[in-house]
Amino acid sequence: MAESKEARDQEMNLKEESKEEKRRNDWWKKDPQGPLESDQWCRVLRQSLPEEKIPSQTCIARRHLGPGPTQHTPSRRDRWIRGQILQTEVLQERLEWRIRGVQQAAKELGEVNRGIWRELYFREDQRGDFSAWGGYQRAQERLWGEQSSPRVLRPGDSKRRRKHL
């Protein structure tokens, strides 16, 4: 008789263990939630974006309003306020995502510009800096009153008229 009791205890233990394992395997499922605390609303409604340091006006308004209807049927004014707050939260999230997009584009633009300047500096290191050459040439022409290199074609004079010379 003692053996049968032990066997039953072992079966019960196995059942409890399997239930616990099932619970452990369900860790990804959401726990059934009661009414949320008023501070939790901001985090829950915008889980995709991290909570900003300074709470926005909308978050402050929601905290002031408190959690959803728990004991009573809300009045029309209460429902309207809640609707407006939801709408502002949606707009706020859209705005934040837009800001993120602009920041991302600015970052990419900065990277491209840095790449361009890196290549320019590399070219300058390889071939030397000729950016001031045109100014130097013009200064020489002004000083001496003649073109420094008449072989270079200007838009005004073509080689055609000098061909027979």
Swiss-Prot record:
Changing residue 161 to A: Complete loss of nuclear import. Keywords: Coiled coil, Host cytoplasm, Host nucleus, mRNA transport, RNA-binding, Transport. Changing residue 160 to A: Complete loss of nuclear import. GO terms for molecular function: RNA binding; structural molecule activity. Residues 1-36, 56-77, 146-165 are annotated as: Disordered. It comes from the Viruses. Pfam families: EIAV_GP90, EIAV_Rev. InterPro entries: EIAV_Rev, Gp90_EIAV. A motif (Nuclear export signal) lies at residues 32-55. Escorts unspliced or incompletely spliced viral pre-mRNAs (late transcripts) out of the nucleus of infected cells. These pre-mRNAs carry two recognition sequences that function as Rev responsive element (RRE), that are not present in fully spliced viral mRNAs (early transcripts). This function is essential since most viral proteins are translated from unspliced or partially spliced pre-mRNAs which cannot exit the nucleus by the pathway used by fully processed cellular mRNAs. The bipartite RNA-binding motif binds to the RREs present in incompletely spliced viral pre-mRNAs. It consists of a central region, and a C-terminal region that also contains the NLS which mediates nuclear localization. These overlapping functions prevent Rev bound to RRE from undesirable return to the nucleus. When Rev binds the RRE, the NLS becomes masked while the NES remains accessible. This is Protein Rev.
